[in-house]
Design a protein with these regions (language model features):
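Conserved ABC ATPase signature
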Residues: 143-147, 151
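Catalytic Walker B motif of ABC-type/P-loop ATPase nucleotide-binding domains
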Residues: 168-171
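Conserved ABC ATPase "signature" region
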Residues: 71, 119-138
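Helix-to-loop junction immediately C-terminal to a conserved catalytic motif
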Residues: 55
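Conserved catalytic motifs of ABC-family nucleotide-binding domains
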Residues: 164
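The feature captures the beta-strand-to-loop junction immediately N-terminal to the Walker
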Residues: 40-42
């Protein structure tokens, strides 16, 4: 989906802290409709705290947060239900209920927000979301303990998609996955963004993910957002953390990987045309 100029998330002057430790101070951020928006930063920069503030699980010291044009700070849970229905969240590690099956985990938000919905329809929706997330259909009756790490991530994603959200929050979705599993999750995220018209707020430390699927990236450091833009735009900034992160060995490897993938995509049509030319 093409990115629009409409802001889905706006954060202004955000200040967060725990006791004497200030995590954010004067943080500003805007996320546009239809983009995959990456958030990166070193340990302790409060990436997850920022997400939790946006979705109402963390109360900031000061600042303003709007989602879909609705003010979120100091809003009663019952008053925010209509906004909360419009987003889905995949927490780091999946955060599945261990005593519920995969299908029952997916059904949780449906039962919470639509208690009068026909149970048969809830079952049908859950089964569809399980498959949509890339899990086999027979994963529904399984418990989280029976799943691999990658399958747990997809089960958590299925639950995040249960309400047909417009906005999807992903907290370190590829953490703990092997390179093949991480790349597959990236491809799934990009595919869903296009087909479902999602806006994606993505916290990650995975450089391959940033290069592969993010439209824009925000860098957290010094208690605020120090830069927002595409990777080339960020590389034009002279902040030492940005330069070390994107121009370090792993950053160069990610760049080379993306460039090689682009070369292979460009070569594929030529090879196909050559093969047709030799037929008959």
């Amino acid at each position: 989906m093409a990115r629009s100029d409409e802001n889905v998330i706006v954060v202004k002057g955000l200040k967060n802290g725990f006791g004497d430790q200030i995590v954010h101070d004067g943080l500003n951020l805007e996320v546009k409709r239809g983009e995959i928006f990456g958030v990166v930063g070193g340990s302790g920069t409060g990436k997850s705290v920022l997400m939790r503030s946006i979705i109402g699980l963390q109360t900031p010291i000061e600042g303003d947060i709007t989602v879909f044009g609705e003010e979120m700070i100091d809003r009663e849970d019952t008053d925010a239900i209509d906004v909360r229905k419009r987003w889905g969240v995949l927490f780091q590690g999946g955060a599945l209920f261990s005593t519920l099956t995969v299908a029952e985990n997916v059904q949780v938000p449906l039962r919470e927000f639509y208690p009068d919905l026909d149970p048969a329809l809830i079952d049908e929706i859950a089964a569809y979301k399980v498959v949509m997330s890339g899990l086999p259909a027979d994963a529904g009756p399984k418990f989280p303990a029976e799943l691999s790490g990658g399958m747990k991530k997809r089960a958590g994603l299925a639950r995040a998609l249960a309400m047909d959200p417009e906005l999807l929050f992903l907290d370190e979705p590829t953490a703990g996955l092997d390179p093949i599993g991480a790349a597959a999750f990236d491809e799934l995220t990009k595919s869903m963004q296009k087909t479902l018209g999602l806006t994606v707020f993505l916290i990650t430390h995975d450089l391959d993910t940033l290069y592969a699927i993010c439209d824009r990236i925000a860098v957290l450091a010094d208690k605020k957002v120090i830069g927002v833009g595409t990777i080339p735009e960020l590389l034009a900034l002279d902040h030492p953390w940005i330069q070390e992160y994107f121009n370090g060995p792993r950053g160069r490897a990610a760049t080379a990987s993306v460039e090689r993938a682009a070369e292979l995509r460009d070569e594929a049509p030529d090879k196909a045309a050559g093969a047709k030319g030799t037929e008959g």
